Amino acid sequence: GKEKGTYERGTSLIVDELKRNWEEHGVFKYWVMDDTFNDTNYKLEAVAEAKEKSGVPLDLTVFLRLDLQNRLKQTELIKNCGITSIYYGIETLNPDSAIAIGKGWHPDEQMAYARELKEKHYHDKIKMFTTFIWGLPEDTKESVRADYKKLLDFEYNKFDHVYMNFLFMRDTESYKNSGAVPTEGE
């Protein structure tokens, strides 16, 4: 596999490619297919610099880690990159399920930070997306219903788009009987 930082392109190469794509094809919208685009400030700084030097009105959709954005204080950098849509992987509002899948930041704290971003920094200029997975190891019918209710609360949930995935791959009798998977009519 690749080592961190070994496949990062220099700013001048990014500027050249942005200009060429813009001038020859009118391209300015990009999906950045890096699952941790904000794992270092370097990437964000390089893109912000490339945007400024190229003069291209970038419109980027990216995957970011909310915890890194908070810890590395990246909000202003993100706003300077031309990012217009962000996908954050929060996954669950159930603290026990979050621990089970290796999420170290309490879900309610993540949602509070997302609210702060939307209300104080992004407003309508940057759209926020997230996905939740229901059927994780610690999920129950009650926790899924509680999560659903929270996500419908527009004061709690400031995401522009929320996608919900249901895990039905645990096709065992014990899991079916746990109550985590709603049955027909529930």
Show where each model-derived region lies.
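Short, electropositive alpha-helical surface patch
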Residues: 43-52, 139-159
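Radical SAM [4Fe-4S] cluster-binding motif and immediate context
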Residues: 1-124, 134, 149
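Flexible glycine/acidic-rich beta-alpha junction loops that bind and position SAM and/or redox cofactors
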Residues: 41-42, 96-101, 132-142, 157-185
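A broadly tuned preference for mixed-charge, low-complexity surface segments
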Residues: 80-89, 143-144, 181-185
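Residue-level detector of anion-binding/catalytic polar loops
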Residues: 84, 127, 157
